[in-house]
Amino acid sequence: MEDVIARFENVLLIYHEPHAETLAIKDISIDFGRGNFTAIVGPSGCGKTTLLSILAGILPPSSGRVEVLGHTLYGDGSEDKRKCRSGAATGCDTGYMLQRDNLLDWRTIEDNVLLGLEIKHMLNDETRSYARELLRRYGLGDFMKLYPRQLSGGMRQKAALIRTLVFRPKLLLLDEPFSALDYQTKLLLADEVHSIIRREGCSAVLVTHDISEAISMCDRIIVLTSRPATVRCDVEIRLKEDSPLARRNDAGFKYYFNLVWEEMMKNEEFN
């Protein structure tokens, strides 16, 4: 892969406990292409969210090399390793969208979107104007003075995404952002979030348990094994449609679903 925005090279993670060690991730190597939307799927507890935490610079691996946006975050002799642990290497170029929206009930939607800018001392007339532009662009302009409790779950998650986008990130990490939503809202919001990410020109990595969601939203799916996690297979998705909703009706959708499902079924916990 020529244009790489992030890379794992032989990444290994061991959790050290008082009387035991647990091998969580074993020798994972993945290149994430710039401009691509990649999904990571696998059994519960296999290490999907752990990989996102490593990409975000939150969790150091036990060994191996990690590069994100041209910075060597982790690796022997890396000068950027210290920067990463202070959060400087990834900076605002990497955004993280969690399962929960984490909106503060006592702040308006606009003030919630501006919170990160305030914390990082980046709030000024220009960034405030850009935040309002994003709220209007993505259908929340009439709701920015309301409070989170007055919005639906889907609208709250969209506000959480905009809170991340105000930093103009180049890489978005999404940790099951639709899992708490009802099925209809989940489908509609996934379609809209996909469109927003494409329009904003971000690269993205999505962690999900939902194979259909992964196929409908992503260009590529990485299937992990049970713990200790390794890469079981790497599937490139080639469908004529780009919209997640339209992809679910694509003739090739079932082929990819069966392909990924069969790989998932090979995991030991299903045998």
Describe the predicted segments one by one.
Residues 41-43:
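The feature captures the beta-strand-to-loop junction immediately N-terminal to the Walker
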Residues 56:
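Helix-to-loop junction immediately C-terminal to a conserved catalytic motif
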Residues 64-75, 79-82, 86-90:
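Conserved ABC transporter NBD signature motif
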Residues 107-114:
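Short coil-to-helix segment of the ABC ATPase nucleotide-binding domain corresponding to the Q-loop/switch region
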Residues 114, 118, 125-143, 195:
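Conserved ABC ATPase "signature" region
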Residues 147-151, 155:
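Conserved ABC ATPase signature
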Residues 166-170:
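A short, proline-enriched helix->beta-strand linker immediately N-terminal to the Walker B motif
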